[in-house]
């Protein structure tokens, strides 16, 4: 390779949407015929006006619609080349994370339990010292530690969205 040559690699497609349509009822479609490829090591934003189906599409990607009877998803969604319907939903949800515009805490869980929810859902055991470190570091990193450090046992709904 010469100093002036450029080495390029083709990025790997990690998520593929193939003609995806989502229906809330047989008469009402929320998303119609969406096809896209999402590549490894890239950040992708789904943008559009309110009510156009952004959140609906994201929920289909991580199989949240299966929790609600009557919602139908057509087309194919492939995660790392495999149909998401052939994978355990929890595996899909671990692989396809989402950040919504207005995330909400679990209202019946304490602030501390909300912070630790990812560890618990993934079966990761931590010592009391590790838990304290995770809570402190996580809440400091988002600027909430000083506000909640004395109320970690209070419900997550205590936190304001504003």
Describe the residue ranges of each PLM region.
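Conserved beta-strand
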Residues: 17-20, 29-42, 75
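Conserved ABC ATPase signature
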Residues: 153-162
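A short, flexible loop at the N-terminus of ABC-type nucleotide-binding domains that lies
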Residues: 9-14, 22-33, 65-70, 86-88
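Short coil-to-helix segment of the ABC ATPase nucleotide-binding domain corresponding to the Q-loop/switch region
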Residues: 58, 108-118
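ABC ATPase NBD coupling module
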Residues: 70-72, 83-97, 121, 128-129
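Conserved ABC ATPase "signature" region
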Residues: 76-83, 120, 128-150
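The feature captures the beta-strand-to-loop junction immediately N-terminal to the Walker
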Residues: 47-49
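ABC nucleotide-binding domain signature
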Residues: 45, 59, 76-77, 90-104, ...
């Amino acid at each position: 390779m010469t100093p002036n040559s450029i080495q390029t690699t083709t990025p790997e497609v990690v998520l593929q949407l193939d003609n995806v349509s989502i229906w809330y009822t047989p008469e009402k479609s929320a998303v119609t015929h969406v096809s896209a490829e999402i590549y490894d090591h890239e950040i992708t934003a789904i943008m559009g006006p309110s009510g156009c189906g952004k959140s609906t599409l994201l929920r289909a990607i991580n199989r949240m619609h299966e929790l609600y009877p009557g919602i139908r998803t057509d087309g194919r969604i492939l995660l790392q080349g495999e149909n998401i319907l052939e994978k355990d939903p929890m595996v899909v949800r671990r692989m396809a994370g989402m950040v919504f515009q207005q995330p909400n805490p679990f209202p019946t869980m304490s602030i501390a339990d909300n912070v630790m929810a990812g560890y618990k859902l993934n079966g990761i055991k931590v010592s009391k010292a590790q838990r304290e470190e995770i809570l402190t570091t996580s809440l400091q990193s988002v600027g909430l530690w000083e506000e909640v450090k004395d109320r970690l046992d209070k419900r997550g709904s205590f936190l304001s969205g504003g």
